[in-house]
Amino acid sequence: MSKRLQSANVHFNESGTPVADSFDDVYFSNESGCDETRHVFINGNDLTERWLNWQSAHFIIAETGFGTGLNCIIAMQQFKQFRAANPAHPLKRLFILSTEKFPLAVADLQHALAVFPSVSEEVHALAERYPPALSGCHRMNFDAWHTSIDLWLGDVHELLPQWHCPLDGLVDAWFLDGFAPSKNPQMWTEALFTQMARLSKT
């Protein structure tokens, strides 16, 4: 049975950047949040090149900290551009599996992402589909972006062991985004890395 979760306690600093009170850490840089995400997660996983060479119909990204959803939004946007440029490509859909223990209230999420006009369409779509703070899996379909997001709300250490993994693996790429290890060491443990290894395609 689903249970109601504690929402994230956040404040916005003098620069308008969202800060997680529980971890005393920012969600992203206001000046370069989108560029940071593209550099660390999109380019860091070489996603555009991998998509071009992908022969399956779907690609699966798993993320260990949904936060404001910015990483998912940027990935959606990039995948939409990929599909528009390559309409006949065999890769048709992006699936993102993301976890979050302390979900933001939708108003805080919208406030946080309002500084990035380049993703305003994606933010609006996410806000329309954003689930209540109840434990479990919440699927959000974004058909215009050829993307589905399964947002798993709860403790990542309890959630990942629940994920069924085919013999050849489940996850094609990982977004590790759980605040700095010094601020949130629970998101950077050996047990978590063991689960990631279990779920990853080889």
Language model: regions and residue ranges:
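A short SAM/SAH-binding and catalytic strip from SAM-dependent methyltransferases
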Residues: 156-157, 171-187
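A generic structural signal for short coil/turn motifs at secondary-structure boundaries
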Residues: 26-28, 161, 182-185
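S-adenosyl-L-methionine
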Residues: 108-166
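Glycine-rich phosphate-binding loop signature in dinucleotide/nucleotide-binding domains
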Residues: 55, 165-169
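Glycine-rich SAM-binding Motif I of class I
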Residues: 68-73
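A short glycine-rich, Lys/Arg-flanked "PGG" loop and its adjoining helix->strand segment in the class I
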Residues: 186-202
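Conserved glycine-centered beta->alpha loop in an early N-terminal alpha/beta scaffold
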Residues: 65
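Rossmann-like AdoMet
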Residues: 1-62, 76-118
